[in-house]
Amino acid sequence: GTRDTGSYATFSAVVNYFEWVGEHFTESKDRRDKIVAAGEAIHAHEKSLTDAMLFGTGNLKGLSDFDEVSIIGGVDNPRREGLVAMNISGMDAGELVEALNGRGIRVHIRKADHYSGNILNPLGLPSCVRVSMCHYNSEQEVARFLEAIRDIVAAR
């Protein structure tokens, strides 16, 4: 069949983007070195954001400091990559998503359906809140999220 040239163009744009990011983290002129540098920098930044979310930043408590918060996959999860799945005890995940979205913080619900059921069903969970971080997010955004969680927990 005919090749999907749009997919190739998109893939090329993604590779070019990673090369551009990598230029900020290496002086090498080699394209592969730049892409590797981008991947390493992105991983380090996302880990820093995830650690701030779990353990706190500045004078803000992290999610692991709230008795009311359960972190799916555990706090000390070396395989965690820029994502925290969580619940607040006694609060419906959909209600938490709405509360955070109402504060301008975009998070998503994951339900025990065809998409996430293979994880949530064995844990006996009907749903959870998924918080994703990426290389373009900042520690200030994590702080805003933690402030919102603090306020939501305090209001319960």
Predicted regions and their residues:
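Pyridoxal 5′-phosphate
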Residues: 1-156
